[in-house]
Each structure stands twice: as structure tokens, then as C-alpha cells.
Regions:
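Conserved DHp (HisKA) dimerization/phosphotransfer helix of two-component histidine kinases, i.e.
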Residues: 1-39
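Short hinge/gating elements
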Residues: 11-14, 44-48, 106-113
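Conserved short strand/loop->alpha-helix "switch" segment adjacent to the catalytic nucleotide/phosphoryl-transfer site
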Residues: 37-64, 70, 113-115
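Glycine-rich nucleotide-binding loop
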Residues: 143-149
């Protein structure tokens, strides 16, 4: 249900505590990713609670990567908790991958606040959430048929 996705990805997500079961995240993002029939989701996120901030980052990165898969493809979504840091990796694989430069700039903190618009708002939010406590966002590609977006959430 789109409303539940938007509440969890962008809002306060009432009904959820400070941690969220990743199965809830998968349940809200999978229909949005696979609904067009051109994109599949490979979910490699272990069970167990994740900080709500990490789940927001994960959901928004999946949506951003999905938008970059112009002709569909596969989204590989993984996450791991290591030494108190949540690592998130989204790998997009498809025949045509295009990431808008302004979205990439928003994700990496290279977009002026005055340039934020509806296309870049999610990236800007993800960057801000990741920066809390010294986290970061990294992007490799698009190159050929793939692109990787990683986040470190502290």
C-alpha cells in the first residue's frame, strides 16, 4: 500500500517504534518495484530489527535506484549490521541505467538547498539522514549495465 510506504519512507511512521522489522520495509517496497512487471527485487536483508533511520534510507535508495532502471532490470538489496554500523547496498542491474545528475548530487551533498525539487527531495533527505552521526552515501556508476549505491548509517 503506497500510503504505508510513504509514511515509513518519509514520515514519522506512527505505529513503528525506533526500530523496524525489515520484512515491513520489503512488504511496502516490493509492490512499487515489481508492479510494472519489468523489475524484480532480490532482497538480501536479514531478519531482525533495524533503526528506523536506516529503513528510511534503504527504502528511499531502492526507489531512487528503481527510477534509474529506465527499461527495468533487477534490484539487489542488501544490509548488514557490523560493529554498530548499518551497511546498506543497492545494486541496480539492467539494460539501460540513467541517474539524473541532480539526484546524484543530492545524494552526495553536492546540491544547493535552493535547487531541491520534487525529483531531488528524496536524495536530499537520504543524504541528511546518513550524515547524522557521521554516516555517508557512496555511488558507483552507472557504468554499463549496473550501478551501486551504498550507505553507512551510524
Amino acid at each position: 500500500d503506497k500510503l504505508k510506504f510513504f509514511r515509513l519512507a518519509f514520515g514519522a511512521a506512527g505505529g513503528f517504534g525506533s526500530e523496524v522489522d525489515p520484512a515491513e520495509a520489503k512488504a511496502v517496497i516490493e509492490p512499487l518495484v515489481t508492479g510494472d512487471g519489468r523489475t524484480t527485487l532480490e532482497w538480501m536483508v536479514p531478519s531482525g530489527l533495524m533503526p528506523k533511520r536506516a529503513v528510511k534510507i534503504l527504502l528511499n535508495l531502492v526507489l531512487i535506484a528503481k527510477d534509474a532502471l529506465v527499461r527495468g532490470g533487477v534490484l539487489h538489496v542488501g544490509s548488514e549490521l557490523r560493529e554498530g554500523e548499518q551497511e546498506i547496498v543497492i545494486r541496480a542491474v539492467g539494460p539501460k541505467i540513467i541517474m539524473d545528475r541532480s539526484v546524484q548530487d543530492a545524494l552526495t551533498g553536492n546540491l544547493a538547498a535552493s535547487e531541491i525539487d520534487s525529483r531531488t527531495a528524496a536524495g536530499w533527505m537520504v543524504y541528511g539522514l546518513a550524515q547524522q552521526n557521521g554516516g555517508l552515501i557512496q555511488i558507483a556508476g552507472p557504468s554499463g549495465d549496473q550501478m551501486v549505491i551504498g550507505a553507512l548509517v551510524r
